[in-house]
A protein has these predicted regions:
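N-terminal, intrinsically disordered, polar/charged segments of Gram-positive cell-envelope systems
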Residues: 27-55
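Functional cores of ribonucleases/endoribonucleases
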Residues: 84-168
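Repeat-associated, polar segments at repeat-unit boundaries in modular proteins
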Residues: 23-25
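Hydrophobic membrane-insertion alpha-helices, especially the h-region
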Residues: 9-21
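Alpha-helical interaction segments
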Residues: 12, 78, 148-150
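Extracytoplasmic/periplasm-facing segments of secreted or lipoprotein envelope proteins
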Residues: 47-104
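N-terminal Sec-pathway targeting helices
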Residues: 1-11
Length: 168
């Protein structure tokens, strides 16, 4: 065998062995992740088809998708002002008793700390998610008038982009 070809052949064989090992170990993981992603996208597609414009929704995923799809909150949300007019007392956690099962949402969010993206004319709004009566929890969705939808699980400590509409 040619002496110049031997190192190239050895490098080729080593590359094949490493590649086989990598793809057999990580490839399985990649396929698993791809499968999970496809299942999630399929579920989202099914949810999107099953969301009714006149429906009531409270979960993070459903409310975010509803805002994305219909550009407004579901009918079961009222602003803080509307809740106060009904007799809501935040400290006592009586929102469901005075509102018939509504959640707080639709109020402006100031973004004072500038932790969410800013743009000319952009306005931010917020709503509670996963609310089950009593005192309000820490989970919120923040959504903008130009199509951005974020989730915070910990009362504005961390933000996660859920949807981004491309405005035309």
């Amino acid at each position: 065998m040619n002496k110049r070809l031997f190192p190239a052949l050895v490098a080729f064989v080593i590359t094949i062995i490493i590649g086989t090992f990598f793809f057999s170990n990580n490839g399985g993981e990649a396929n698993k992740n791809a499968q999970i992603l496809l299942e999630q996208l399929n579920k989202e597609g099914q949810k999107s088809q099953s969301l009714a414009e006149n429906g009531s929704y409270t979960s993070k995923d459903e409310v975010a998708l509803y805002i994305y799809k219909f550009n407004k909150l579901p009918k079961n949300f009222i602003t803080k002002k509307e809740a106060l007019e009904l007799g809501w007392d935040a400290k006592s956690g009586n929102l469901w008793q005075v509102s018939g099962g509504k959640s707080i949402g639709g109020d402006r969010f100031s973004n004072r700390e500038k932790r969410l993206p800013e743009a000319d004319g952009r306005k931010w709004f917020e709503c509670d998610v996963n609310y089950n009566g009593g005192r309000r929890g820490a989970e919120r969705i923040l959504y903008s008038n130009d199509g951005l939808i974020y989730y915070t699980p910990d009362h504005y400590e961390h933000f996660y982009l859920l949807y981004e509409k491309r405005m035309q």
